[in-house]
Amino acid sequence: MKKLKVSKMEILVRYGEIGLKSDPIRKNLEEILRKNIIKLLRKYEIDAEVKILHRKLLVKINTKDKEDLALKLLKKVAGIVSYSPVYECPLDINEIVSFAVQIMKKKLKTLNKEKVTFAVKTKRSYKKFPFTSVEVNKKVGEAIVEKLGLEVDLENPDIVLGIEILNDGAYIFTEKYEGIGGLPAGSQGKVLCLISDGIDSPVAAFMMIRRGCRAVLLHLKMSEEALNKVRKIVEVLSDYDTELEFVVYDYKKDIEDIVEKLKSIKKENYTCIFCKRKMLKVAEKYAKYLDCDAIVTGDNLGQVASQTLKNLRVISENINYPILRPLIGLDKNDIVKIAKEIGTYEISTEKEIKCPYLPKHPKTIAKPEEVKKIKEKVKLV
């Protein structure tokens, strides 16, 4: 029997809906995912080899002392559903049993507990392996009970020993980390995301990256303070999309022009409406120039004055690009939860920067005909 020796960490990566695609599309998505893993690890000076297996990927970490960092980074790769540090062994039932016992013995040393229970869960993707999943579970479980004296608990075990039988070997593990799921970034086109220092827009950008888009983040600058916060947010999001682009447009003159013109006709309550219309017009120009396929905003229905359904209609009416609003139906608590999980919440809330141009009584139900009259009267977009 071979002794358990590990010189380099190996991580088995699992994907979800990629596996539902046709073979040509699946293979293309697997390759994009493979490259995205390598790019993110290289960003942190981690050398790795990524091999495509049967509906899974295997990541071999070549840089010592950065294995824990590599495990954290894989959490940020869109397309990964789960992953596990694994021990690889030959497709031989005796070798699998031997490796499993050694792995469990090693795992026990990390637990400060007298009575330890376990369960064995095998997935046999390689159907030519002569033992079924149930038979592997039984043989491995019996050996662990006999040699280590542990008790089986299939309902709530302290340790779950996982075994994946693939056509090139068996992969055994005791840890399973959750990924963010979705599709590999870059597989579904490019979007232009309006980004501010608030909670919502970074989450909207993340959700589009998770669905396979490359993102261009456009910040409409109104203050240096807000821009500095946005730069920190962009740095966080750049882990989720290693090809992320960031663009800054000086918006202060535009908003001041809007406010001045609306004041001249005593229609200051329409400030948010015309501000958002102008923002989308600027976004549309950048989207065309940068060859993006859609515009993304952090709008959440009913959250603020400009995000009522009536207002969203008049805000969007003169834009010829698709406008995607991934947060539109979420509760605020759901958005906050995602922001905390992806690492942008603390930055967004470190100091609230209120909009100095917000009117006392913003218009919540704007009529298209009224907006048209104002637009034509003071020459706004």
From Swiss-Prot:
Residues that hold ATP according to the record: L194, I195, K276, G298, Q307
Gene3D superfamilies: 3.30.2130.30, HUPs
GO BP of this protein: thiamine biosynthetic process; thiamine diphosphate biosynthetic process; thiazole biosynthetic process; tRNA 4-thiouridine biosynthesis
MF (Gene Ontology): ATP binding; CCA tRNA nucleotidyltransferase activity; tRNA binding; tRNA-uracil-4 sulfurtransferase activity
Domain THUMP positions: 68-176
Location relative to the cell: Cytoplasm
Broad class of where this protein is predominantly found: cytoplasm
EC assignment: 2.8.1.4
Keywords: ATP-binding, Cytoplasm, Nucleotide-binding, RNA-binding, Thiamine biosynthesis, Transferase, tRNA-binding
Source domain of life: Archaea
Alphabetical list of Pfam families matching this protein: ThiI (PF02568), ThiI_fer (PF22025), THUMP (PF02926)
Annotated pathway: Cofactor biosynthesis; thiamine diphosphate biosynthesis
A single GO cellular-component term on record: cytosol
Catalytic activity reported: [ThiI sulfur-carrier protein]-S-sulfanyl-L-cysteine + a uridine in tRNA + 2 reduced [2Fe-2S]-[ferredoxin] + ATP + H(+) = [ThiI sulfur-carrier protein]-L-cysteine + a 4-thiouridine in tRNA + 2 oxidized [2Fe-2S]-[ferredoxin] + AMP + diphosphate; [ThiS sulfur-carrier protein]-C-terminal Gly-Gly-AMP + S-sulfanyl-L-cysteinyl-[cysteine desulfurase] + AH2 = [ThiS sulfur-carrier protein]-C-terminal-Gly-aminoethanethioate + L-cysteinyl-[cysteine desulfurase] + A + AMP + 2 H(+)
Family: Belongs to the ThiI family.
Function: Catalyzes the ATP-dependent transfer of a sulfur to tRNA to produce 4-thiouridine in position 8 of tRNAs, which functions as a near-UV photosensor. Also catalyzes the transfer of sulfur to the sulfur carrier protein ThiS, forming ThiS-thiocarboxylate. This is a step in the synthesis of thiazole, in the thiamine biosynthesis pathway. The sulfur is donated as persulfide by IscS.
Protein name: Probable tRNA sulfurtransferase
